[in-house]
Amino acid sequence: MAGSKQIFGADELDLVANYLQAGGVLAYPSESVWGLGCDAFNTDAINQIINLKHRDIGKGLIVLTDAAERLKSLIDVSHETSLLDYMQNFSDEFTHKHSRALTWLMPIQSSVLPSVLIGSHDTLAVRITTHPLLKDLCHALISPTNPYGFLVSTSCNLSKSTPAKNLTQAMGYFGDQIAYLDTDGLGFAQPSCIKDLLAGHILR
């Protein structure tokens, strides 16, 4: 959607969801730095993000969702209900205590997702977002083609450059090639912590 720059306000989430479902790419504030995202089941939009950022396709991409319960049919382990409860509760407690978002690496039934989300890995990186507006946006993205409400979330920058921290910096990177959500982030100082769901190891 090159040449279709648009700035959405916080009260236009339905329009934002429609834009994303039509294949648009969006820069938006997250818990810390700005993110760059799209509907996680639109492979053309995902490839546009990878090309815009000059990102290694093997790295995979983080996705956001609004609640752990969305993942029930996706997670590829036994006792999934107790694990999902743990994910939700631990995420909430961790964010409250550390003022830092938490991204999980979880085993999945990979055949149901675009392979580019996983890259060269065997797990999906998923964050149960604590940003109120992004929670609402993920919910608005739920559809027959995206039953999990997944929103791609990669840092808003060119590969190896400093992530954007405000609208002006985001527009400086991508100009009229994408759209923007003009609202506030949560102001966390650090990027999300990354934790392996099964092994329990913190990787970042």
UniProtKB/Swiss-Prot annotation:
Chief site of localization: cytoplasm
Pfam families referenced in this protein's UniProt entry, alphabetically: Sua5_yciO_yrdC
Any one GO biological process: regulation of translational fidelity
Superkingdom of source: Bacteria
EC primary class: transferase
SUPFAM superfamilies: YrdC/RibB (SSF55821)
Catalysed reactions listed for this entry: L-threonine + hydrogencarbonate + ATP = L-threonylcarbamoyladenylate + diphosphate + H2O
Domain YrdC-like: residue ranges: 10-204
HAMAP family for this protein: TsaC (MF_01852)
Protein name according to UniProt: Threonylcarbamoyl-AMP synthase
Organism: Moraxella catarrhalis (strain BBH18)
